[in-house]
Amino acid sequence: MAFNRRSKNITQGISRSPNRSMYYAMGYEKEDFDKPMVGVANGHSTITPCNSGLQKLADIAIKTIKDSGGNPQVFGTPTISDGMSMGTEGMKYSLISREVIADCIETAVNGQWMDGVLVIGGCDKNMPGGMIAMLRTNVPSIYVYGGTIKPGNWKGKDLTIVSAFEAVGEFTAGRMSQEDFDGIERNACPSAGSCGGMYTANTMSSSFEALGLALPYSSTMANPDDEKVGSAAESARVLIEAIKNDLKPRDIVTRKAIENAVAVIMATGGSTNAVLHFLAIAHAAEVEWTIDDFERMRKKVPVICDLKPSGKYVATDLHKAGGIPQVMKVLLDAGLLHGDCMTITGQTVAEALAHIPSVPRADQHVIHPIKDALYEQGHLAILKGNLSPEGCVAKITGLKNPVITGPARVFDDEYSAMDAIMANKIVAGDVLVMRYLGPKGGPGMPEMLAPTSALVGQGLGESVGLITDGRFSGGTWGMVVGHVSPEAFVGGLIGLVEEGDSVTIDAHKLLIQLNVPEEEIARRRANWKQPAPRYTRGVLSKFAALASSASKGAVTG
């Protein structure tokens, strides 16, 4: 049986002789035209440590595809460093890069009639961008995560990149010495790999393992370790088998599979960005999934992993404790996973977990049994109210002050808010309102890690509320609410909040409310005018014109 189901369209027949001439120029032989053409979407880049260790994974995948009877076709995908662009205009390109990556992969795979694709990525938006493309093209596919960074260390304390962001606030508040500030800066990132807590990259990689389109254990391996190369090779072998069996992403990514992925996100205390990205992934898979489904899942899935940013441990600790397979086995035995879902290996979830012990090892403290869950319900809550009738996202577990009502401190951009924080003009009890930062208004929903980390560093992380129509980094924690929809730019109520207004965030009631009389709101709405777009050309302008509401995943098509 021939497995070049798609590529035969450009390699077979008399009329394709010129095509074969071009392949011969790249070292192909006649017998290669009967083999499947397998894309390798290589996200290697020296822009960021998240992607700087990917080439070795691409190299072994290329070799393994060839040794397994395929023709590897390598092409590059771009990346943005969320950490480096944070707090600058560059952060506006972060979410947009999700769409750009998806478009790049879709264009190469479909333009060249590839029979399958192996996607390699590292930084945050590489994951959803690659997955969206895999689902759009619906050719046999597998995701290879570049791996997590190892924890840094300073004076015996483990560090992540968030340690460096929080140090900015501590240092400027006079709560940290120059020696410690410099020491954290120099030692926070000791290797290649993505940011080490259960931040966005590790959240998405873990969810892909649960979804069934990445290999078991692959999502928590560290990039520098040899097992990461071995996993990339095995991924290539598994992909060739999937091509032979015509096992495609949409055969795997069903509504039940997405429930499995979201269950793991809740159980591990994952990033708020997962809400946005899984809305987009479901859209690409043509699976019915809404923002309210996250709240449904939150109510039944406990948090069983003690992971940063709000917990103690990092992804490498999770790996040593048994990784995502151990988390999934605990959830499966509790009736919180669908064991009959298919995975890219050809096994069901239940079959893949059959050899995993039901109870986590006693010599680790990262993964808890259900009876000893850290929190009885999940952490990613969907809040609604007059400020966000479509829904917005907050992490609500572990909050010392789950309810706050305070005066609004209103900022129409991130920079003025950051200036106010650094000048010590924000005090306990305030509610920061950062707006015109949504999909269309930002544009691109920039992340607010710099201001939230500065507040934490100043000791205000538990006593100040923050709401925005932008996003938060996976490293953010505290009384913060993002993805407020509808956004200010399209007339959402967040755009009508005035300095000093009373605003309530209530994690118990899942409420976000502007405490202003309806008559006053109506008066303000009558006087509101949509501002001019911040960009009128280029990719930012394109995204602003096409992006849907954050409550729909900020998808562009």
Curated annotation (Swiss-Prot):
Q: Which cofactor does it need?
A: [2Fe-2S] cluster; Mg(2+)
Cofactor binding remark = Binds 1 [2Fe-2S] cluster per subunit. This cluster acts as a Lewis acid cofactor.
| Any Pfam family | ILV_EDD_C
| Catalytic site positions | 473 (proton acceptor)
Give residues annotated as binding Mg(2+). Answer: 82, 124-125, 447
Asked if the Swiss-Prot or TrEMBL record annotates the protein with the keyword Iron-sulfur, the reply is: yes
Q: Could you list this entry's UniProt keywords, alphabetically sorted.
A: 2Fe-2S, Amino-acid biosynthesis, Branched-chain amino acid biosynthesis, Iron, Iron-sulfur, Lyase, Magnesium, Metal-binding
Pathway(s) served? Amino-acid biosynthesis; L-isoleucine biosynthesis; L-isoleucine from 2-oxobutanoate: step 3/4; Amino-acid biosynthesis; L-valine biosynthesis; L-valine from pyruvate: step 3/4
Enzyme class comes to lyase
- HAMAP family listed in its UniProt record: IlvD
Tell me the protein family, please.
Belongs to the IlvD/Edd family.
Q: What is this protein called?
A: Dihydroxy-acid dehydratase
In its UniProt entry, the species of origin is given as Janthinobacterium sp. (strain Marseille) (Minibacterium massiliensis)
